[in-house]
Regions:
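ATP-dependent carboxylate-amine ligase catalytic core
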Residues: 22-29, 34-45, 70-156, 172-174, ...
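Glycine- and other small-residue-rich loops at beta-strand/loop junctions that grip anionic moieties
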Residues: 53, 121, 197-199
Length: 245
């Protein structure tokens, strides 16, 4: 296979619900877990930050990756969708995964993952995990694809979870109210794992996150409580702390 043929193969694994609609939507993480078992759980070899929410996931993920890289860490970044090049989805210290690795992943492991009937998203995710492990990243920023609770990325055990905000998105899959959607997004909150919540929207949404965090003993921080202490200067591209003076 050349690179374009490899991409055609990967795209052909797009789940039926993407082509047909909600009627073909299958709940559960069985495929993701089975695929991860085949590869030996590579995401356990580095720290993870899981980023979910309705809007701003990509921006937050990229900002975090840049901050950590500037702090001296080797950083993996997994985001979706891509704009131009498939390889935008998988980066280490800002550099996209090379084409040869994408080809090698499919050719080398195809016989192993095809019996699982893994989707495009599951394969891409596992490719990222394996690549990050082989590149020996210190930490990986993992962006949720859709929802949270049943997203293929939700097999990881992150060191920090982030939920940017809640809006009415993918209502056929996540629910038709903000609280129902919040409950799906809250699915990435893990036991004992700190979670940062961005824009709350309303008290009912906030309560969904509070209840979920309490049920798994996860420390929870609402960023809106702290952001009032800061002011953004967009002209100078700076953020200032408002002191008592």
């Amino acid at each position: 296979m050349n690179y374009n043929e490899t991409l055609d193969y990967l795209y052909s694994q797009a789940p039926e619900y993407q082509r047909i609609g909600h009627a073909a939507y299958k709940e559960g993480l069985d495929n993701s877990l089975a695929l991860d078992e085949i590869f030996g759980h590579p995401h356990k070899k580095f720290k993870n930050i899981h980023v979910g929410g309705t809007n701003g996931k990509g921006s937050v993920s990229n900002l975090l990756a840049a901050i950590l890289q500037m702090s001296g860490y080797r950083v993996g970044l997994y985001t979706s969708p891509h704009l131009i090049d498939f390889r935008e989805r998988i980066r280490v210290n800002g550099e996209m995964i090379n084409k040869e690795y994408v080809i090698e992943f499919v050719e080398k492991y195809r016989d192993k993952f095809e019996p699982v009937m893994a989707s495009f998203f599951e394969l891409t995710m596992e490719m990222a995990f394996l690549y990050f492990a082989e590149k020996k990243v210190d930490v990986a920023i993992i962006e949720v694809g859709l929802g949270g609770r049943l997203d293929s990325t939700n097999i990881i055990f992150p060191d920090l979870s982030i939920i940017t905000n809640i809006g009415l998105d993918h209502m056929n899959y996540l629910g038709n109210t903000l609280t129902k959607i919040a409950a799906e997004k809250a699915g990435i909150i893990k036991k004992y794992t700190p979670v940062i919540i961005g824009e709350i929207g309303n008290s009912d949404v906030a309560q969904v996150f509070i209840d979920k965090a309490k049920s798994v003993e996860a420390p929870i921080v609402f960023s809106e409580v702290y952001m009032s202490d800061f002011v953004a200067d967009r002209l100078r591209d700076k953020i200032f702390y408002k002191s008592a003076n």
